[in-house]
Amino acid sequence: MLQTLQKLLGDPNDRKIRQYRPVVKLINSLEIEIASLSDAELKAKTTEFRQRLDRGESLDDLLPEAFAVVREAAKRVLNLRHYDVQLIGGMVLHEGQIAEMKTGEGKTLVATLPAYLNGLTGKGVHIVTVNGYLARRDSEWMGQVHRFLGLTVGLVQEGMSPEEKRRSYNCDITYCTNSELGFDYLRDNMATDIKEVMQRPFNYCIIDEVDSILIDEARTPLIISGQVARPSEKYLRAAQVARELIRDEHYEVDEKARNVILTDEGFEAAERLLGVSDLFDPKDPWAHFVFNAVKAKELFIKDVHYIVRNQEVVIVDEFTGRVLPGRRWSDGLHQAVEAKEGVPIQSESQTLATITYQNLFLLYPKLSGMTGTARTEEAEFGKTYNLEVTVIPTNRPIRRKDAPDLVYKTERGKWQAVAEEIAHMHAQGRPVLVGTTSVEKSERLSAMLKEMGIPHNLLNAKPENVEREAEIIAQAGRKGAVTIATNMAGRGTDIILGGNAEYMARLKLRERLMPKLAQLDADNPLGSVQMVGRGGGQGFGGTAPKPKKSWTVVSPNFYPCELSARTNQALDEVVAAAVTKYGLNRLPELVVEDLIAVASEKAPVQDPLILQLREVYNSIKAEYEKITEAEHEEVVRLGGLHVIGTERHESRRIDNQLRGRAGRQGDPGSSRFFLSLEDNLLKIFGGERVAKLMDMFRVEEDMPIEHPLLSSSLENAQRKVEVYYFDMRKQVFEYDEVMNNQRRAIYSERRRILEGENLKTKILDYVRKTVGEIVRAHVNPELPPEEWEIDKLTAKMQEFVPLLKQNLKVEDLQDLSYEQILDYLIKQAELAYEAKEAFLDTFEPGLMRKAERFFLLQQVDTLWREHLQQMEALREAVGLRGYGQKDPLIEYKNEGYELFLEMMDNIRRNTVYNLFIFTPQIVQVPQASRPAPAPTAAASPDPSSASGVVEADFTEE
């Protein structure tokens, strides 16, 4: 019935695409007219569009002509013309949707269309990429189009100064990474001066690889933290206890929730081994350490979730297989893993500011994104972000053939079948890409292929393999190439049939330039950094100095041909010119990588050396292309790239990303998944039924089975996992929404304090409220006056407002009514405040205004930090209330709101108290050694560490 209805109504996505066709027709009809314009006339269109916006026209009114202008500019500047389907992609992005575009369909070029159109408003467009290299490349490469048309283009990179970032954020179009954007948002909300704020209000955002950022990273909070000392011996002893405890006897493991639960026997055993009577004793708490130690033992597996490098535990991203140096698991988990591995335990951190990507990107009034795979997560994008997904048709039809899955009884049988399939394809000469889910499994398959004598390349998170990433990817599409990769998702690299001549030319430059220009490892603080290729540049390369360094490619016969004598001579000349300009072995390796990257891209440059490098690069590429293009034709004839999946991922989207490596831009290709009943997915989510079926039919371990029941079991398992993780992300989102409302309130208040020229009105309001609180605490109007605590009230007022010690007496209040007492004390406090201000003016005119801002910010920041910890503790505590038939989320909302109100009251009270009691002290500073300004919040996030106001130092009496 449903299928019949769908046939009658048609695919809703096709209907959506049809709506855009008339606009595409209109844009195409403008092409000849726009092409006839001179460069100056084309640039003048930007001014014309802005004037039309000022006159009341909308962006939608301008869209056809603006898109035609961008298409023409791209033709002139980049020699690239937007296809019709790319125009549709641009419209989808402009409307605040997600455009699903297959690998190799030119997402980067598509983004120029909505970026230009929305950039005309002057309110700012952010184009967000997953790593710094891509942000820089796109700002230089695609930025040419925008600069040609008169828009300003900014780039935000890690390590830039706040001033450089501010300039970039003020541009019409800004390229940045998701993490830097988030951290800058947090830093802005820790600034102690409005001049330190870098970002302006968010307007429109285009996210590249939107599924990676909004779904895979959704549960990862961005955290700015300060270090807190914690006893490392507790982690070590807890690790010893965890080694003694036995699974299923002392604790149970919930693989789905990635959690451990201690049994009664487990609690007793842990208490006995530690020699304590109660793991939860507040004076000597052990429960947290023991739970984390058991989690580290059972749920965090070496070479799957992390690797140990240079005596450090480094996280491996489960989606991309990349190492994430600098990232640490929070809440003491990282320390527990360090204790388990016997490496030095680093100190814990206290959260100073935090936000999740979910809430960060929901701050944009208009949000859009691009990815190769979003359809499977359509429901989540809709419910969480209110984003529609539109699948953009490919420019050429997809020719990839996806074979049905083969399922084996045991893992051993599966790996044997995978090895045989590789041997079969290799014998035909077809390139093969094998996706594995962990370092350990990739090495197991590698060992099997070595035994069979099949040459292959291994790409996983191990440093020695990571450094060869560009080299491995460059030849993954060559005839007979076999590549084993851990999670190809997010590697951001197209595998080109016949070999990637661009990469090969880049590596040839690198091979010759690095030994001459790069500092030797002993002097190179950056250690070894891998080739910065597409998708590279984030967290690769070891940091330990190596005794000897070589930049020569490892693979024999890597280069498709010997270079001609003329090109070799040009290469020698450019290397000599580079040494003359920069000196022998004087540059950090990363700087040389940048030189090569800029030379091999199309961004405009003035530097004569880079222009010479670019000329040599193009000559090398042209010679290699003669061979790779011929090989491309041969590989196409053989059937293209064959992709083998060795396990179903928890998300169908990641499987689709692996499959999508084959059949790019209309090339042929094929894919097949090999699975076993011992795979994690089937083991955790319902492989028992299938296992019983196999036992019943006595299926051998090396015999694959295909059965409708099996296919439906697999799909159900993946759907269950997707729903499970969606529910988890939804739960995180619902809880974080509570924090988000509070965060928005406190950050808005903080911004008002930063921007407020005169905070006196706010402070006097605080004074009146605080006096009212003190009066209510000691005077109850419903009781007779003889029961009022006038003496305590007087003492408390004198404590809060020291200037009243001389003027306020108990007898002043004796015969007054409640209202009269309140009015009298408020008036006295206001007079005391005026007197305090006059006193401070004798030190420096306007000092009270600076003091008001200083103490307000100090209290907001200090109490917000404490509040974050309280909310984290509350979140853990309410989880247990579900057993008492209470909704934990409602409890969290209600109690969190109470905590928030209490924090706001404390900010008010503490600020009033501090302003009344502090006394400035004149600090004699010799002119010659005048101190540098206090660091910004980004460098020193704790405003309580600020060194004072001018030469005054805030001290309590």
Swiss-Prot record:
One of its GO terms (cellular component) is plasma membrane-derived thylakoid membrane. Residues 929-957 are annotated as: Disordered. HAMAP family: SecA. Belongs to the SecA family. It is a peripheral membrane protein. Its main location: membrane. One of its GO terms (molecular function) is ATP binding. It comes from Synechococcus sp. (strain JA-2-3B'a(2-13)) (Cyanobacteria bacterium Yellowstone B-Prime). Monomer and homodimer. Part of the essential Sec protein translocation apparatus which comprises SecA, SecYEG and auxiliary proteins SecDF. Other proteins may also be involved. Keywords: ATP-binding, Cell inner membrane, Cell membrane, Cytoplasm, Membrane, Nucleotide-binding, Protein transport, Thylakoid, Translocase, Translocation, Transport. ATP binds at residues 86, 104-108, 494. Disulfide bonds: none annotated. The lineage of its organism: Bacteria, Bacillati, Cyanobacteriota, Cyanophyceae, Synechococcales. This is Protein translocase subunit SecA. It is found in: Cell inner membrane; Cellular thylakoid membrane; Cytoplasm. Its EC number is 7.4.2.8. Part of the Sec protein translocase complex. Interacts with the SecYEG preprotein conducting channel. Has a central role in coupling the hydrolysis of ATP to the transfer of proteins into and across the cell membrane, serving as an ATP-driven molecular motor driving the stepwise translocation of polypeptide chains across the membrane. Probably participates in protein translocation into and across both the cytoplasmic and thylakoid membranes in cyanobacterial cells.
